[in-house]
Amino acid sequence: AHEGYQIYNGYMGSTSDQSIGKLKELGVNSLTIIPYSGFRSMNKPFPISYTTGAGGENDASILHAAYTAHQNGMSVMLKPQLWSWLGWTGDITMTNQKDWDLFFEYYEQWIMHYALMAEMYRFEMFCIGVEFQNASLSEHNKWDELFDKVRKIYTGKITYAANWGKEFETVSFWDKLDFIAVNCYYPLSTKMNPTDEELLTAFEKNLDVIEA
Protein backbone atom coordinates (compact mmCIF):
# COMPACT_ATOMS: atom_id res chain seq x y z
CA ALA A 1 0.00 0.00 0.00
CA HIS A 2 1.06 3.60 -0.52
CA GLU A 3 0.37 6.69 1.55
CA GLY A 4 -2.78 8.32 0.23
CA TYR A 5 -3.48 5.35 -1.99
CA GLN A 6 -4.97 2.56 0.10
CA ILE A 7 -4.73 -0.77 -1.68
CA TYR A 8 -3.81 -4.37 -1.05
CA ASN A 9 -3.29 -7.30 -3.40
CA GLY A 10 -1.80 -5.07 -6.07
CA TYR A 11 -3.32 -2.76 -8.64
CA MET A 12 -5.72 -5.51 -9.77
CA GLY A 13 -7.45 -5.57 -6.40
CA SER A 14 -10.90 -4.02 -6.03
CA THR A 15 -9.60 -1.53 -3.48
CA SER A 16 -7.26 -0.10 -6.11
CA ASP A 17 -10.20 0.96 -8.27
CA GLN A 18 -12.00 2.32 -5.22
CA SER A 19 -8.96 4.31 -4.18
CA ILE A 20 -8.62 5.85 -7.64
CA GLY A 21 -12.28 6.86 -7.43
CA LYS A 22 -11.66 8.53 -4.06
CA LEU A 23 -8.67 10.39 -5.48
CA LYS A 24 -10.85 11.72 -8.29
CA GLU A 25 -13.34 13.02 -5.71
CA LEU A 26 -10.46 14.89 -4.04
CA GLY A 27 -9.62 16.59 -7.33
CA VAL A 28 -6.53 14.53 -8.16
CA ASN A 29 -5.71 14.77 -11.86
CA SER A 30 -2.58 12.62 -12.15
CA LEU A 31 -1.61 9.15 -10.92
CA THR A 32 1.84 7.59 -10.56
CA ILE A 33 2.03 3.82 -11.02
CA ILE A 34 5.11 2.16 -9.51
CA PRO A 35 6.18 -1.34 -10.58
CA TYR A 36 8.85 -2.50 -8.15
CA SER A 37 11.70 -4.92 -8.59
CA GLY A 38 14.46 -5.95 -6.20
CA PHE A 39 18.23 -5.66 -6.45
CA ARG A 40 20.53 -8.36 -5.16
CA SER A 41 23.85 -6.60 -4.64
CA MET A 42 25.12 -3.16 -3.71
CA ASN A 43 28.40 -3.50 -5.64
CA LYS A 44 27.95 -6.14 -8.35
CA PRO A 45 25.84 -5.92 -11.52
CA PHE A 46 22.69 -8.04 -11.45
CA PRO A 47 19.90 -8.98 -13.89
CA ILE A 48 16.63 -7.32 -12.90
CA SER A 49 13.47 -9.42 -12.87
CA TYR A 50 9.92 -8.36 -13.61
CA THR A 51 7.06 -8.70 -11.15
CA THR A 52 4.75 -11.50 -12.26
CA GLY A 53 2.80 -12.42 -9.13
CA ALA A 54 -0.92 -11.77 -8.96
CA GLY A 55 -0.53 -9.56 -5.89
CA GLY A 56 2.32 -7.51 -7.31
CA GLU A 57 2.74 -4.85 -9.95
CA ASN A 58 2.70 -7.18 -12.95
CA ASP A 59 2.06 -5.84 -16.44
CA ALA A 60 -1.65 -6.65 -16.42
CA SER A 61 -2.20 -4.84 -13.13
CA ILE A 62 -0.25 -1.79 -14.33
CA LEU A 63 -2.41 -1.55 -17.44
CA HIS A 64 -5.57 -2.02 -15.39
CA ALA A 65 -4.65 0.81 -13.02
CA ALA A 66 -3.68 3.06 -15.93
CA TYR A 67 -6.96 2.35 -17.72
CA THR A 68 -8.92 3.12 -14.56
CA ALA A 69 -7.00 6.36 -14.06
CA HIS A 70 -7.60 7.45 -17.65
CA GLN A 71 -11.29 6.62 -17.34
CA ASN A 72 -11.36 8.95 -14.34
CA GLY A 73 -9.78 11.78 -16.30
CA MET A 74 -6.29 11.44 -14.83
CA SER A 75 -2.95 11.50 -16.56
CA VAL A 76 -0.55 8.66 -15.77
CA MET A 77 3.14 8.54 -14.95
CA LEU A 78 4.86 5.17 -14.96
CA LYS A 79 7.71 5.12 -12.44
CA PRO A 80 9.56 1.78 -12.30
CA GLN A 81 11.61 1.53 -9.13
CA LEU A 82 14.24 -0.75 -7.57
CA TRP A 83 14.06 -1.57 -3.88
CA SER A 84 15.79 -3.96 -1.49
CA TRP A 85 16.37 -4.77 2.16
CA LEU A 86 20.09 -4.59 1.34
CA GLY A 87 20.08 -0.82 1.38
CA TRP A 88 19.21 2.33 -0.52
CA THR A 89 19.55 2.46 -4.31
CA GLY A 90 21.54 5.67 -3.94
CA ASP A 91 24.33 3.66 -2.33
CA ILE A 92 24.71 1.19 -5.20
CA THR A 93 28.32 1.55 -6.34
CA MET A 94 30.25 -0.63 -8.77
CA THR A 95 33.97 -1.11 -8.16
CA ASN A 96 35.11 -0.74 -11.78
CA GLN A 97 33.91 0.57 -15.12
CA LYS A 98 33.28 -2.90 -16.54
CA ASP A 99 30.78 -3.58 -13.78
CA TRP A 100 29.15 -0.18 -14.25
CA ASP A 101 28.73 -0.96 -17.96
CA LEU A 102 27.07 -4.27 -17.17
CA PHE A 103 24.92 -2.70 -14.47
CA PHE A 104 23.53 -0.20 -16.98
CA GLU A 105 23.09 -2.94 -19.58
CA TYR A 106 20.86 -4.86 -17.18
CA TYR A 107 19.04 -1.70 -16.11
CA GLU A 108 18.43 -0.66 -19.71
CA GLN A 109 16.88 -4.04 -20.53
CA TRP A 110 14.53 -3.65 -17.58
CA ILE A 111 13.56 -0.01 -18.03
CA MET A 112 13.01 -0.28 -21.79
CA HIS A 113 10.30 -2.86 -21.20
CA TYR A 114 8.34 -0.24 -19.29
CA ALA A 115 9.19 2.56 -21.71
CA LEU A 116 7.65 0.51 -24.51
CA MET A 117 4.58 -0.16 -22.38
CA ALA A 118 4.24 3.55 -21.63
CA GLU A 119 4.36 4.33 -25.35
CA MET A 120 2.00 1.58 -26.47
CA TYR A 121 -0.64 2.50 -23.91
CA ARG A 122 -0.14 6.25 -24.12
CA PHE A 123 0.99 7.01 -20.60
CA GLU A 124 1.60 10.73 -20.42
CA MET A 125 4.83 10.60 -18.40
CA PHE A 126 7.67 8.18 -17.76
CA CYS A 127 10.22 8.26 -14.94
CA ILE A 128 13.48 6.60 -16.00
CA GLY A 129 15.18 6.28 -12.62
CA VAL A 130 14.68 6.82 -8.91
CA GLU A 131 17.35 7.93 -6.41
CA PHE A 132 20.45 6.33 -7.95
CA GLN A 133 22.60 8.96 -6.28
CA ASN A 134 26.03 7.36 -6.71
CA ALA A 135 25.22 6.17 -10.21
CA SER A 136 23.72 9.49 -11.31
CA LEU A 137 26.64 11.57 -10.03
CA SER A 138 29.47 9.32 -11.22
CA GLU A 139 27.99 7.86 -14.42
CA HIS A 140 26.05 10.78 -15.87
CA ASN A 141 27.12 9.87 -19.43
CA LYS A 142 25.41 6.51 -19.03
CA TRP A 143 22.21 8.26 -18.02
CA ASP A 144 22.48 10.63 -20.99
CA GLU A 145 22.72 7.62 -23.30
CA LEU A 146 19.77 5.94 -21.61
CA PHE A 147 17.59 9.04 -21.88
CA ASP A 148 18.34 9.22 -25.62
CA LYS A 149 17.47 5.55 -26.09
CA VAL A 150 14.18 5.92 -24.23
CA ARG A 151 13.21 8.91 -26.38
CA LYS A 152 13.59 6.76 -29.49
CA ILE A 153 10.66 4.59 -28.43
CA TYR A 154 8.69 6.80 -26.03
CA THR A 155 7.17 10.09 -27.17
CA GLY A 156 5.69 11.33 -23.89
CA LYS A 157 7.35 13.42 -21.21
CA ILE A 158 10.33 11.92 -19.39
CA THR A 159 11.93 12.66 -16.04
CA TYR A 160 14.20 11.23 -13.34
CA ALA A 161 13.30 11.28 -9.63
CA ALA A 162 16.34 12.53 -7.70
CA ASN A 163 16.79 12.26 -3.97
CA TRP A 164 16.56 15.50 -2.03
CA GLY A 165 19.84 17.19 -1.18
CA LYS A 166 23.11 16.29 -2.85
CA GLU A 167 21.75 14.37 -5.84
CA PHE A 168 19.00 16.81 -6.76
CA GLU A 169 21.24 19.83 -6.24
CA THR A 170 24.30 18.61 -8.18
CA VAL A 171 23.17 16.13 -10.85
CA SER A 172 24.16 17.32 -14.34
CA PHE A 173 21.52 15.90 -16.67
CA TRP A 174 18.39 17.96 -15.98
CA ASP A 175 18.67 19.59 -19.41
CA LYS A 176 18.12 16.17 -21.00
CA LEU A 177 14.67 15.81 -19.43
CA ASP A 178 11.27 17.42 -19.86
CA PHE A 179 10.89 18.35 -16.21
CA ILE A 180 12.77 18.09 -12.93
CA ALA A 181 11.58 15.63 -10.28
CA VAL A 182 12.74 15.57 -6.67
CA ASN A 183 11.67 13.24 -3.88
CA CYS A 184 11.29 16.15 -1.51
CA TYR A 185 12.08 14.83 1.95
CA TYR A 186 13.93 17.93 3.11
CA PRO A 187 13.57 18.05 6.93
CA LEU A 188 11.49 20.89 8.33
CA SER A 189 12.22 20.62 12.05
CA THR A 190 13.90 18.51 14.72
CA LYS A 191 11.36 19.57 17.33
CA MET A 192 8.64 17.26 18.57
CA ASN A 193 5.99 19.99 18.30
CA PRO A 194 7.10 22.75 15.93
CA THR A 195 4.75 25.63 15.29
CA ASP A 196 3.09 26.19 11.95
CA GLU A 197 5.24 29.28 11.48
CA GLU A 198 8.45 27.32 12.09
CA LEU A 199 7.42 24.68 9.58
CA LEU A 200 6.47 27.31 7.01
CA THR A 201 9.77 29.15 7.44
CA ALA A 202 11.74 25.92 7.02
CA PHE A 203 9.68 24.97 3.98
CA GLU A 204 10.30 28.33 2.34
CA LYS A 205 14.06 27.94 2.88
CA ASN A 206 13.95 24.53 1.22
CA LEU A 207 11.83 25.97 -1.58
CA ASP A 208 14.54 28.55 -2.24
CA VAL A 209 17.03 25.69 -2.69
CA ILE A 210 14.69 23.83 -5.04
CA GLU A 211 13.92 26.88 -7.16
CA ALA A 212 17.62 27.76 -7.44
Regions picked out by a protein language model, each given a short descriptive name:
Residues 1-23:
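Boundary/entry segment of secreted carbohydrate-active catalytic domains
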Residues 15-19, 109-114, 162-172, 207-210:
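Alpha-helical scaffolding within the catalytic cores
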Residues 16, 58-62, 107, 111, ...:
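Aromatic/hydrophobic pocket-lining residues that form the small-molecule binding cavity
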Residues 26-46, 59-136:
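Substrate-binding cleft and catalytic face of glycoside hydrolase catalytic domains
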Residues 48-52, 100-101, 130-137, 187-205:
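Surface-exposed cleft-lining segments at the edges of enzyme active sites
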Residues 49-51, 94-97, 176-178:
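Short, hinge-like loop/turn segments at secondary-structure boundaries
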Residues 57-60, 64-75, 79, 152, ...:
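Glycoside hydrolase catalytic-domain groove-lining segments
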Residues 75-88, 125-137, 144-169, 212:
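Aromatic-lined carbohydrate-recognition surfaces of secreted/lumenal glycan-active proteins
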